[in-house]
Amino acid sequence: MKIFSISNQKGGVGKTTTSVNLAASLALNKQKVLLIDLDPQGNASSGAGIDKLTLNNSIYETLIGQETINDVVRASEDNMFDIAPANQSLAGAEIEMVNIDHREYILKNAFKTLKKTYDYILIDCPPALNLLTVNALAASDSVIIPMQCEYYALEGLSDLVNTIKKVKKSLNPDIEIEGLLRTLFDRRN
């Protein structure tokens, strides 16, 4: 099983679009895929056809210890891949996670039960360098960094790379940057 985080603390760079399309592409190639929506906006969930307003269980419940990952996973609307959906309740997860021992490893520990179930787990990260993102990085083998083709995108990239280095040093020595993915490319610029 290979675990990828799709991460960039800058919003609007194509993390969710990349995550959903990569999940669908891998599924079309006969791979068993789980998409984790770790963004409180829940757009990956919407993209997978999940109604965020009627969710009973989401990744939030897994992060705060109320449900296992297996309890929150459901099929995407088209049954191509599975998803652990998110909604606005995820915005409060960090406050509740603060008092949990080894809180940086909640996702990593949750994934242990999935080893033989999926070929790939893709984590759509929030647009922030917060505890949710640290959880994703601590659980991942690799990071894909979607990045707009513009000068200011480089400023945020160094912050993300430094965070990944810190995670590699203290939480996950095996994590690697898989690569940068140029998004929103305009030949005129």
Features from the language model and the residues they span:
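P-loop NTP-binding core
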Residues: 1-189
